[in-house]
Amino acid sequence: MSNKIQAIRGMNDLLPEQSPVWQYFERQIQHLMQRYGYNEIRTPILEQTALFKRSIGEVTDIVEKEMYTFEDRNGDSLTLRPEGTASCVRAALENGLLYNQTQRLWYQGPMFRHERPQKGRYRQFHQVGVEAYGMLGPDIDFEMILLSARLWDALGLMPHVRLELNSLGSSEARAAYRDALVAYFEAHAEVLDEDSRRRLTSNPLRILDSKNPDMAEMLEAAPRLMDHLDDESRAHFEQLTAMLDAAGIDYVINPRLVRGLDYYSRTVFEWTTQALGSQGTVCAGGRYDGLVEQLGGKPTPGVGFAMGVERLILLLETLDLVPEAARSRPDVYLTAMGDTASREAMLLGEHLRDALPEMHLQVHCGGGSFKSQIKKADKSGARIALMLGDDEIASGSVGIKFLREDREQESVAREALAARLQALLAED
């Protein structure tokens, strides 16, 4: 039996061949957030369990079944964060970020849920979250959707995703709708599965999220939340859809879109795709105007969304939308034959990095034959191998070998090498 220690199920290593694609995605995010005036916030991965029970809701699947919760040595109940919004609100309140001011914040990092691992979904997964506080109108909801749409454009994903919208209304409207929904489900109790019967008393709106095909027809005929909206929420939603129409952003109103977290109110939205099978949501969010007060602050409107990084990278790779330039590999691999050449190669490498800061250069270490070094240069993916040996040192030159083209080798004077490489790398 092997005594190797392996990664925990559902918690994966991000290997060197994968990380350049993540870095490409993260660069797109950082650039976009700067353009829209959002500031990054970083919160701990561990929080008091009470934070999530109070915000997400004690009778949600996340709190009941999925959280990683334990007691520390002081007997305090701690939880690995299952999502980022509650932590963001907690940090903003604790540090006075919401006092008489608006805030636009974003974050990225690992989240943890004890779910069944499946394609693109893991127990440790990464999210990018975007949150805005202190703005009550539909214009900030619109900005959230515009921001996410601009990201899809930048990544080439816009033709492959669909925006779904709904409004959950005010808490009073939801209470009235809840009563109508419970009455309807009780009248169709024989169709409900065991999970839905349990939710009937705790969280009946979540029954609408069921994927049970035996319940599909009954759910399709269920009362619609849109028919129970208060006037203010209806006006808010109509203004939002008018803005989307004016911007030319297509959307579908999905009356069964309720979101899995208790803190949402009014606008909720999801971006979905058909390209990843049945688990098609890649980004989701909405308003949570009561959450700040729920966590001990003054009444403060909030809206935000989160996207799963693993899901989006899987989507990019499935659709072959990762630019070749995003897959990191050296432009140039510098080989060195002999001890003197090895020392000289290190110094030459530093000189070239100073002269050509955008060039990716890898210097061979560890010796070996000329053949083995060229083989490693080729395997690295570099376009060009530089060759430095005793003869080149004596003549003050460097050999250039083209690894991806059928071209004659060149010999270039050391002082002209940077200029020659710059010209070669500029070629298509």
From Swiss-Prot:
State the Gene Ontology BP annotations: histidyl-tRNA aminoacylation
Q: Does the keyword Iron-sulfur apply?
A: no
Task: Using the UniProt record, give the first listed, main subcellular location.
Answer: cytoplasm
EC?
A: 6.1.1.21
The places in or outside the cell where this protein is found are: Cytoplasm
Entry's Gene Ontology cellular component terms:
cytoplasm
PROSITE patterns per the UniProt record, alphabetical: AA_TRNA_LIGASE_II
Q: Which CDD domains match?
A: HisRS-like_core, HisRS_anticodon
Q: What class of enzyme is it?
A: ligase
Task: Supply the Pfam families for this chain.
Answer: HGTP_anticodon, tRNA-synt_His
Q: Tell me the GO molecular function terms.
A: ATP binding; histidine-tRNA ligase activity
What's its catalytic activity?
A: tRNA(His) + L-histidine + ATP = L-histidyl-tRNA(His) + AMP + diphosphate + H(+)
Q: Which domain of life is it from?
A: Bacteria
Q: Which UniProt keywords apply?
A: Aminoacyl-tRNA synthetase, ATP-binding, Cytoplasm, Ligase, Nucleotide-binding, Protein biosynthesis
Subunit and interaction comment: Homodimer.
Q: Which family does it belong to?
A: Belongs to the class-II aminoacyl-tRNA synthetase family.
HAMAP family in the record: His_tRNA_synth
Please identify the protein, giving its name as recorded.
Answer: Histidine--tRNA ligase
Organism for this UniProt entry: Chromohalobacter salexigens (strain ATCC BAA-138 / DSM 3043 / CIP 106854 / NCIMB 13768 / 1H11)
